[in-house]
Amino acid sequence: MKHGMWKPWTLGIGAVAVVALLGVRAARVAAGGGQAGGGTASRLLAGSIDFHVHGLPDMEPRSVDSADLARTAKDRGMRALVLKNHFDPTASLAYTVRKQVPGIEVFGGIVLNRTVGGINARAVEHMTQVTGGWGRVVWFPTRDSEYQVAAEVKDNPASKRPSVSVSKNGALLPEVKDVIAVIAKHQLVLETGHSSPQDSLLLLAEGKKQGVQHMMVTHGAFEMSLAQMQEAVKLGGFIEFVYRIIPMKDGANAKFTPAALAQLLRTIGVEWCVLSSDLGNPAYAMPTEGFGEFLSKMLAAGMTERELAQMTKDNPARLLGLPAS
C-alpha cells in the first residue's frame, strides 16, 4: 500500500506525549477548537461540509468526541459533517449528535468491514431504517478490504487475517451488486473505501449501471493514477482528497505539494473533486482546525475561494442530496 495511508492506527509519538497532547486539545475544544489560520480559515470553513471525519465513540483512539466535534464545527460556521467509523455504523450517532448539537447537519453511514458482516445488503437496508434517516453513505471495505490486508501482509506476514473481497477474476461478486441495488433504491452515496483502483472502477461502473446518483472514490489520489481518476469521473464518481495528501505542520506523510495538488484538482475538474479532512487521529491536527489549515494552504497555493467552495460546499451538498448553499 503506497504512502502508508491505510495502515491501522499507530502512534507517531510516545504514549506520555499523547496523553499530554489530548489534554491540551480537550481544552482547545472547550474553548472553540483553535483558529486554524485565523480569519482566512474561518472564512473558508463557513458553510463547508466535512465529508470524512472520525470522532468518539470508536474502538480506536480519537482526538475528540463526536458531539464536541459538531459543536466546534458549528461554532466555525460549518454546514455539515459526515461521521465515519471503520467498524460501527454511524446513523444512530448522527441522530444523537443532531439532538445534542442543533444547528449543524450531521450524517452517518456504514463501512462494509467484517464487523457488519462484510458485503451485507441487509445491514445497508437496516441503516436506512434508523431513526432520522441520517445514514446516507455506504463505504465498501476499508480496513478489512482484500487490497489493504494484502498490502499489510506484504509488509508484515504476521499480520495475515481474513479480508473482505468485492471481486473475483475481474468481476464484482453477486453480493456486491446486491448492495449496490440497495444504494440505488435509497439514493445513498456509494464510496469505494480502500478498494484497489481496478475494483473502485468496477464499483463505479456497476453503480452507474444500476442508477446510483451519488458516488465518490475514497481519498482516490493515494492509489489511483490520473488516468484512473479521469475514468472514475467519466463513470460519474467524485474524487476525494484529504488533509494528509499535502505537507502539514504535524509532519503527516504527503504525496503532493499544495501547488501540485491545485494543478491536479484543476486537471480533473474542481466540479468533480471533494476536499475532506479524514481527521480524528490524535497524532494529527484536531479535525476542524486541520480542515481549515488544509483549505488555507490550498488558497495560498493559488486556488480561488470559489474553487474551494465548489469542493467543500457545492459538491458535498450534491452528494448528500442537499440544496445548494
Spell out what each predicted region is.
Residues 42-44, 74, 94-103, 126-133, ...:
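Acidic (Asp/Glu)-rich catalytic clusters
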Residues 181, 188-193, 197-256, 274:
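Catalytic pocket-lining loop regions of alpha/beta-barrel enzymes
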Residues 117-197, 203-216:
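Extended substrate/RNA-proximal surfaces in nucleic-acid metabolism proteins
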Residues 54-56, 86, 109-115, 141-145, ...:
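Active-site beta-loop-alpha junctions enriched in small/polar residues
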Residues 29-104:
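An N-terminally biased module of ancient metal coordination in phosphate/nucleic-acid-related enzymes
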